[in-house]
A protein has these predicted regions:
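Bacterial N-terminal signal peptides
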Residues: 8-20
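Flexible, surface-exposed loop/linker segments and immediately adjacent secondary-structure boundaries
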Residues: 24-75, 79-200
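N-terminal secretory signal peptides that target proteins for export/translocation
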Residues: 1-6
Length: 202
């Protein structure tokens, strides 16, 4: 075996080990959804430094994975409680907690880091609406059984779209509320709630 072949073999073994670690971490986590539809590039990563896997139709996605859509990427996830989550281009988010046992302890906690999602809630929001949370760097969104779109525009995204940076929540049906340390406001169908992004650290 030449030194070049040996190098390639070591590189291949290292890559396989990284993928195996990713699969092991995913296998020991709780699933929250399956990929129902997808176009372009959408990936899921377990940890930092992340080992990402490209998602395909039928793949399972897990609590704790960081999902990221490229600028050409979109996906629809069918959640384990019968709800749907549409991932918009450029979105990044993590589902930190999920339980769907059709009981009062059901819960869903999502951290939206940037970009937009559309969420059609399943039975978690119906059985335990207080256990449903979508958080961004500037606000927390709760629901009362609904179809809504949540966005967090970073400074870069806001400049690109000629909008203000911050959290946006548009309600299609049902009702949500947007909450900060200063209080909360209800958002009805056809309305958009907005909270400015926090100032950069000094």
């Amino acid at each position: 075996m030449t030194s070049r072949h040996f190098f390639y073999l070591l590189f291949w073994l290292a890559a396989q080990a990284l993928l195996a670690c990713h699969a092991l971490a995913a296998d020991t986590a709780r699933s929250f959804a399956q990929v129902w539809r997808i176009s372009g590039s959408v990936s899921a990563a377990v940890a930092e430094p992340a080992v990402a896997r490209g998602l395909r139709v039928g793949d399972t996605v897990y609590v704790g994975e960081r999902l990221q859509a490229a600028t050409n990427g979109e996906a629809v996830l069918r959640m384990d409680d019968g709800g749907y989550l549409a991932v918009r281009p450029g979105a990044q988010f993590v589902v930190d907690d999920f339980a769907a046992d059709q009981s009062g302890s059901d819960r869903f906690s999502l951290r939206l880091l940037q970009g937009g999602l559309r969420l059609i809630t399943g039975w978690v929001a119906k059985l335990n609406p207080r256990g449903y949370r979508v958080s961004t760097p500037s606000a927390t969104i709760g629901v009362r059984g609904t179809d809504h779109e949540a966005y967090f525009l970073t400074d870069t995204l806001a400049q690109t779209l000629s909008q203000k940076s911050g959290t946006y929540d548009r309600v299609v049906s049902g009702q949500t509320y947007v909450e900060t340390r200063d209080g909360s406001v209800d958002v009805a169908p056809g309305q958009v709630g907005f909270v400015r992004a926090p100032p950069p650290p000094r």
